[in-house]
Amino acid sequence: MAALAVNKPGAGVDSGRQGSRGTAVVKVLECGVCEDVFSLQGDKVPRLLLCGHTVCHDCLTRLPLHGRAIRCPFDRQVTDLGDSGVWGLKKNFALLELLERLQNGHIGQYGAAEEAIGTSGESIIRCDEDEAHVASVYCTVCATHLCSDCSQVTHSTKTLAKHRRVPLADKPHEKTMCCQHQVHAIEFVCLEEGCQTSPLMCCVCKEYGKHQGHKHSVLEPEANQIRASILDMAHCIRTFTEEISDYSRKLVGIVQHIEGGEQIVEDGIGMAHTEHVPGTAENARSCVRAYFSDLHETLCRQEEMALSVVDAHVREKLIWLRQQQEDMTILLSQVSTACLHCEKTLQQDDCRVVLAKQEITRLLETLQKQQQQFTEVADHIQLDASIPVTFTKDNRVHIGPKMEIRVVTLGLDGAGKTTILFKLKQDEFMQPIPTIGFNVETVEYKNLKFTIWDVGGKHKLRPLWKHYYLNTQAVVFVVDSSHRDRISEAHSELAKLLTEKELRDALLLIFANKQDVAGALSVEEITELLSLHKLCCGRSWYIQGCDARSGMGLYEGLDWLSRQLVAAGVLDVA
């Protein structure tokens, strides 16, 4: 042992250095904020800040937020956080690798493990005769680890040469002795259900001890079977671990795609520089900003157009009012002149009064005509400073108390078109009379004035429908719910109607009339029989059940038209 000490000078110094290095390693593995040791996962996983410092995940979550950023607790530099917050910060993988090596017994240059590690990753066993040598064989008789040279030297005699020596890989496991009978090795395993004692037993335990009469198995095959199960389990665990790792990598990739980041690229002359790669989150925000930017521009244009309409209306109204002011001033001047002339005539003598009779008569006739004209003008003109404004769905402005809408009512003969029209107009039931030609009536509802054209539905009149399509904003198609056999005919006429170019932007309101009749088709059945979802695809349409006799459902249909045409109610601007 003295020679060994001489062969290793400065061993104490080396051990001191190793101790100081070990302390330094521990310091590196501690979080500088909470002084807890980092872990491979969980709240103590190390994460990198932009300045290069490493802080555990738990401490990062406790740091105060400054908007979407945090400050380093050591140098106060700012690190921006993405949408994932602290979870989006990169892990310190170099530190994690060092932690993993230390946990697995890898010591590197510091010598923290009890055994050295070879290049193949297997433990190196020292020779029992000379620790400077590496053992390569095992003597099963001497129970010693020997290198090849020491094996030859120590077993050079005839007696010892007979000892069985095997490679270390074939070294047999040492037999475990029974705790109850120390002289006997454990050879069997108890398989008895309900046995409360240790399953390991020797031959004495099996024959005479607590396991007497129990089911049993030989130790080695049982251990090999368990090893095989463990290997299968380990294989499953490795497969499961690979699946988890692959899923985790996908999650990391998705997070990076969402958040974006910096990417190193080379320019045309080979110089590398960082370039920001936008993530899907930033792209989505850009799409939202672009959409609302276009929307703002469109609204601004529509606002300017609406203001120009209002300005033109105000300008025309003021011009007309000022013209009326001038006319009234002239009229007032003429009336005042006539009054003065009459007063002067009254002051004159009788002869002059008689001579002025004709002139006074003409003057009075002129005044009467002017008074009559003034009365007619005053009766027809409403002196109101309000400016009623109505907005359509496409943000166009209409100025006036009522917005006029042109509506065409179509359908087969006998469906109840005229009955619906006069019920809306006069709130009266009108006996069904075939319409020859057309009827036109004005129906005021809320802030709308519907000009409704009721066109006859007889077969010979249907070719004339096209003459009423121009400038039509809404089509009311009336269906007789009580005549199931005419639904296909109504479908054919409606299909032709919807192919007309002049009606492609018109609203379509379908009245399922005569819902009060027993056995009438329901709204759902008519919708299916007319194939409305397919026929009216891409068009604004609505079907409303109604009864023209009682008026049930008629105003609900007008409500739908009002909602489709008008974006806001009438605003009285003083």
UniProtKB/Swiss-Prot annotation:
Role description: Acts as an E3 ubiquitin-protein ligase. Plays an essential role in autophagy activation during viral infection. Mechanistically, activates TANK-binding kinase 1/TBK1 by facilitating its dimerization and ability to phosphorylate the selective autophagy receptor SQSTM1. In order to achieve this function, TRIM23 mediates 'Lys-27'-linked auto-ubiquitination of its ADP-ribosylation factor (ARF) domain to induce its GTPase activity and its recruitment to autophagosomes.
Compartments (UniProt record): Cytoplasm; Endomembrane system; Golgi apparatus membrane; Lysosome membrane
B box-type zinc finger segments: 122-168
UniProt entry tagged with the keyword Cell membrane: no
EC top class, as a word: transferase
Reactions listed under catalytic activity: S-ubiquitinyl-[E2 ubiquitin-conjugating enzyme]-L-cysteine + [acceptor protein]-L-lysine = [E2 ubiquitin-conjugating enzyme]-L-cysteine + N(6)-ubiquitinyl-[acceptor protein]-L-lysine
Organism per entry: Mus musculus (Mouse)
Pathway(s) served: Protein modification; protein ubiquitination
Taxonomic classification: Eukaryota, Metazoa, Chordata, Craniata, Vertebrata
Positions of GTP binding: 411-418, 454-458, 513-516
Any GO BP: positive regulation of autophagy
InterPro entries given in the database record: Bbox_C, P-loop_NTPase, Small_GTP-bd, Small_GTPase_ARF, Small_GTPase_ARF/SAR, Znf-RING_euk, Znf_B-box, Znf_C2H2_type
Annotated protein name in UniProt: E3 ubiquitin-protein ligase TRIM23
Zinc finger (RING-type): 31-76
